[in-house]
Amino acid sequence: MAQRERNREERGREERDSEFVDKLVHINRVAKVVKGGRRFGFAALVVVGDQKGRVGFGHGKAREVPEAIRKATEAAKRDMIFVPLRSGRTLHHDVEGRHGAGKVLLRAAPAGKGIIAGGPMRAVFETLGVQDVVAKSLGSSNPYNMVRATFDALKHQMHPKDIAAQRGIKYSTLQARRHDVVGSEE
């Protein structure tokens, strides 16, 4: 009886996990120096998302690569954030993020533009569900700093309704202003 319940729980966990897409961003061989020499292990950086606006990243370390990836994936699923997307495909506004010496600039893009971003940032956008974005990384090219800077930028992403509420104006007024500005640029 207990075995059946355990199997049911595992199936439920697998169904929940199947909704997520995970991408391995970086794997690194690390060494711990001990009295007898060096002990080698692996560190993995993984990004996990549901391609509907939820995304997280995790770091895992272990003696074997698959175990490091599993730990990183579990850490990423525990620490996810929600990012509001415009039309489910791009960002609402341009934003900048920083972490350490890494700095990233994220710009909303028109439909059909695609994901124009370098390595670690591309993995974040693909798992997030963004289809059109232009991103530029400045400073550090360390994958850990780039991913953390990207998450810093995404945390500052706000829905226009929230911006309108902060400013004390109607959402429709904000949208009208946005269309006036976008229309004058073309």
Swiss-Prot record:
SUPFAM superfamilies: dsRNA-binding domain-like, Ribosomal protein S5 domain 2-like. GO terms for cellular component: small ribosomal subunit. The keyword Ribosomal protein applies. PROSITE patterns: RIBOSOMAL_S5 (PS00585), S5_DSRBD (PS50881). Keywords: Ribonucleoprotein, Ribosomal protein, RNA-binding, rRNA-binding. Residues 20-83 form the S5 DRBM domain. InterPro entries: Ribosomal_Su5_D2-typ_SF, Ribosomal_uS5, Ribosomal_uS5_bac-type, Ribosomal_uS5_C, Ribosomal_uS5_N, Ribosomal_uS5_N_CS, Ribsml_uS5_D2-typ_fold_subgr. GO terms for biological process: translation. The keyword S-adenosyl-L-methionine does not apply. One of its GO terms (molecular function) is rRNA binding. PANTHER family: MITOCHONDRIAL RIBOSOMAL PROTEIN S5. Belongs to the universal ribosomal protein uS5 family. The N-terminal domain interacts with the head of the 30S subunit; the C-terminal domain interacts with the body and contacts protein S4. The interaction surface between S4 and S5 is involved in control of translational fidelity. With S4 and S12 plays an important role in translational accuracy. Located at the back of the 30S subunit body where it stabilizes the conformation of the head with respect to the body. Part of the 30S ribosomal subunit. Contacts proteins S4 and S8. This is Small ribosomal subunit protein uS5. It comes from Brucella canis (strain ATCC 23365 / NCTC 10854 / RM-666).
